């Protein structure tokens, strides 16, 4: 049985079902679907074609919108924004790479696209040694040619 407690709002074509809970000042609208054991709380906002399932917790001022699906045991909090555009490369030159609207994550290093584009060789070496620099010298021209910094 789903719950909507306190001043939480669910409207539009949004659906909350299963054991899902929406409470505090959370807002769910548009075509958002929340189900299984998901919890949406505090001032979180979910809208458009969002699907949240599993043991996902969305809280704080987090916003999830557009065509995003979140499942499993994820927690999204703070001022986080889940985004539609995500490109992932697995094990490219020994690094996993994820590219979103504003960020690039290479291995365990996540930075704004503009930061990546302007890192010096010294800064790249400080991240993961000479192997990182070798990778960066191959990947950066590829990223530029693909428009990944745009």
Where are these regions (language model features)?
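Intrinsic low-complexity/IDR segments
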Residues: 1, 6-7, 48, 73, ...
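A detector of tandem-repeat and repeat-rich interaction/domain scaffolds
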Residues: 2-83
């Amino acid at each position: 049985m789903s719950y909507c407690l306190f001043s939480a709002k669910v409207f539009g074509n949004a659906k909350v079902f299963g054991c899902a809970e929406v409470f505090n000042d959370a807002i769910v609208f548009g075509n958002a679907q929340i189900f299984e054991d998901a919890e949406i709380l505090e001032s979180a906002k979910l809208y458009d074609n969002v699907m949240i399932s599993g043991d996902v917790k969305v809280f704080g001022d987090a916003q999830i919108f557009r065509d995003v699906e979140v499942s499993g045991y994820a927690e999204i909090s703070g001022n986080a924004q889940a985004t539609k555009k995500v490109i992932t490369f697995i094990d490219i030159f020994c690094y996993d790479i994820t590219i979103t609207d504003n960020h690039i994550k290479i291995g365990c290093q996540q930075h704004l696209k503009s930061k990546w584009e302007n890192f010096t060789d010294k800064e790249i070496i400080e991240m993961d040694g000479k192997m990182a620099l070798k990778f960066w010298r191959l990947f950066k021209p590829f990223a530029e040619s693909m428009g990944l910094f745009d």
